[in-house]
Structures are given as structure tokens and as C-alpha cells.
UniProtKB/Swiss-Prot annotation:
Pathway(s): Lipid metabolism; leukotriene C4 biosynthesis; Lipid metabolism; arachidonate metabolism
Entry EC no(s): 2.5.1.-, 1.11.1.-, 4.4.1.20
GO BP term, example: prostanoid metabolic process
Protein name per the record: Glutathione S-transferase 3, mitochondrial
Organism of origin: Bos taurus
GO CC, alphabetical: endoplasmic reticulum; mitochondrial outer membrane; nuclear envelope
InterPro entries: MAPEG (IPR050997), MAPEG-like_dom_sf (IPR023352), Membr-assoc_MAPEG (IPR001129)
Domain of life: Eukaryota
Chief place of localization: mitochondrion
PANTHER family for the chain: GLUTATHIONE S-TRANSFERASE 3, MITOCHONDRIAL (PTHR10250:SF26), MICROSOMAL GLUTATHIONE S-TRANSFERASE (PTHR10250)
Key words of the record: Lipid metabolism, Lipoprotein, Lyase, Membrane, Mitochondrion, Mitochondrion outer membrane, Oxidoreductase, Palmitate, Transferase, Transmembrane, Transmembrane helix
Keyword field contains Ribosomal protein: no
S-palmitoyl cysteine lipid attachment residues: 151
Amino acid sequence: MAVLSKEYGFVILTGAASFLMVTHLAINVSKARKKYKVEYPTMYSTDPENGHIFNCIQRAHQNTLEVYPPFLFFLAVGGVYHPRIVSGLGLAWIVGRVLYAYGYYTGEPRKRQRGALSFIALIGLMGTTVCSAFQHLGWVRTGLNSGCKSCH
């Protein structure tokens, strides 16, 4: 039986916080559906006056959902060997996705770039996952004082 470190609790809390962020974005889409009168199952508005804003709110949520599975995978796996680093990167990803969404909500898609932090954090999470795989396979030693190359 594998035993996770006590610090893995931070990873679990980060995953829970990410769910709250995704839920927040979903609620924003629901509110926008009412405001802009876009009924289910219609995905996008064709209203020439306000449809663009609704579509930006919808896309911000969908774009986040598109990267959510890899985020959760990298969070869970990278956190096995690097729970603190992964939790910090996970929180940066969450903040970045909120900045991305609210930039997109302006109706000017280029303002999504405010959330570039989320992309950088996701690359970092991928790196910790690859590093964790190397450590698990014994290709690098674990720990800072191992006397050889490691992923730390």
C-alpha cells in the first residue's frame, strides 16, 4: 500500500479550490444566459447587439473546462512527490483562470492574456509530473541532499 505524505492534503485542498473556481464560472454563464436571454440548449447567442458578450462569457468557461482534466491529472500525480510546489502552482493556475475569464468577459478576447499565469502554471505542473515519474522510476534520486541530480 502506498502512503501519501501529510503535505498531500494541500494538493487535495487545491483540487477542491479549483472546483469552486469552475463552479463560479458556471454560475456566471447561468446568470449571463438569463441576462442575454440565451435558452438551453443553445450554446451561443446570435444577437447582434449583446450576443458577443454572452459568447465571451460562455467561451471563458468552456476554455477552462478544456484544460481542467490535464490540470487535475498534473495536480494529483505531480503532488505525490512535490506537494508544496504543486499546490502553489495549482493556486497560480486558479488565479490565472479567473483573470483569464474576467478579461474575456470584457468582450475583448485579447484581454484573456491577463490570465497567462495559468498557462505558465500548467507548464510547471506538467514539469512536476514528469519529474515525479522520473523519481518513481528511480532515474533521479529524491530529496535535496541526495548528492546527485534531482528534480528539486
